[in-house]
Amino acid sequence: MDLRESDGAVWAVGLMSGTSMDGIDAALLRTDGHQVFEVGPALTVAYDEATRARIRALLGTPPGRSVAEVADLARDLTERHAEVAARLIGQSGVTPAVVGFHGQTLLHRPEARLSVQIGDGALLARRLGVAVVNDLRQADVRAGGQGAPLVPAYHLALAKGLARPLAVLNLGGVGNVTWIGEGDQPPVAFDTGPGNALIDDWMRRRRGVAMDADGALARSGRIDGAALEALLGHDYFRKPAPKSLDRDAFSLEPVNGLSDGDGAATLVAFTAASVARARDWMPAPPKRWLVCGGGRRNGAIMEALTRGLGVAVDPVEAVGWDGDALEAQAFAFLAVRGARGLPLTWPTTTGAPRPLTGGTYWPAATVLGASAVAR
């Protein structure tokens, strides 16, 4: 079945590897691109530290790194995504019509109309024998939009029946929020600021571990007011929404002189304060915040958000959503929408000039040889 020539509900696989570089999330979803009819199983496979180091070395595509290095990483990551998707499909017994493949972001500079996600859609389609939609950000970026965030379309579909105004906050490496209002208002979305990236970088530098489990180190420290003020002085917070960030937009320099605990506490406060400031760009204050992404597992962040926002702040599991699978589910949903020419972004979510569809469609019989680097 060619998904582009049908309009019924189908099973789709979503594959996501985010800016936190934790690993690959895969999820199954049955949808027609408008509604979610059934949520299937999900799977997460962590990257080993060597893979994270390879990705980290190429973030921002630094000078001195060859095209061959990027292409090799793209191929290897695509093969890993194929293995994870094949496992999920095999375990579920479901035959998907399409796979939504985000790829790994190395660079995001929408002001230069540039966003780089590596991954070979043709190779993935060949390995799985399933059609693939990738390059989901490119049409928006080329049209002058931010290319991010992309998940608001999925949040909007899930939020049917929930009290509004509602904010859905994703705390991955970068924080992003979707504001959902009453009636038929289009969603408003943008990156709020740091998510877990700075805290993870701090823990790696100071303690040699990947994260601050449950915010234990942050809870042991004190917030440094001067360092927090310096962090919040970044130009990004003065820009109107819609807006988006590269993972490495912020620096650890303001906290470098602090103790391990005080630095962690200050970085948690930075994430929470940037979310609180995001309300300035919303049409109305949210009655409730639902949090997904790895940040919802950090108790120090969740406590700081509750103090700073003054309304209910809950993990998305409180309304029956799967916070670990949500972004992968979103890319399954977006793959169906993109294949059928439905909007993925709006002026209120990315600053695009009009509602835009997107994605490159690779039929299951695609021949190998297409470029593995999407620009």
UniProtKB/Swiss-Prot annotation:
Positions contributing to ATP binding: G18, T19, S20, M21, D22, G23, I24, D25
Enzyme Commission code: 2.7.1.170
A Gene Ontology BP annotation from the UniProt entry: amino sugar metabolic process
UniProt catalytic activity: 1,6-anhydro-N-acetyl-beta-muramate + ATP + H2O = N-acetyl-D-muramate 6-phosphate + ADP + H(+)
GO molecular function: ATP binding; kinase activity; phosphotransferase activity, alcohol group as acceptor
Pathway linked to the protein: Amino-sugar metabolism; 1,6-anhydro-N-acetylmuramate degradation; Cell wall biogenesis; peptidoglycan recycling
InterPro entries linked to this entry: Anhydro_N_Ac-Mur_kinase, ATPase_NBD
Enzyme class (EC, first level): transferase
Keyword vocabulary terms for this entry: ATP-binding, Carbohydrate metabolism, Kinase, Nucleotide-binding, Transferase
Function per UniProt: Catalyzes the specific phosphorylation of 1,6-anhydro-N-acetylmuramic acid (anhMurNAc) with the simultaneous cleavage of the 1,6-anhydro ring, generating MurNAc-6-P. Is required for the utilization of anhMurNAc either imported from the medium or derived from its own cell wall murein, and thus plays a role in cell wall recycling.
NCBIfam families xref list: PRK09585.1-5
PANTHER family linked: ANHYDRO-N-ACETYLMURAMIC ACID KINASE (PTHR30605:SF0)
Family classification: Belongs to the anhydro-N-acetylmuramic acid kinase family.
Name by which UniProt lists this protein: Anhydro-N-acetylmuramic acid kinase
Organism: Rhodospirillum rubrum (strain ATCC 11170 / ATH 1.1.1 / DSM 467 / LMG 4362 / NCIMB 8255 / S1)
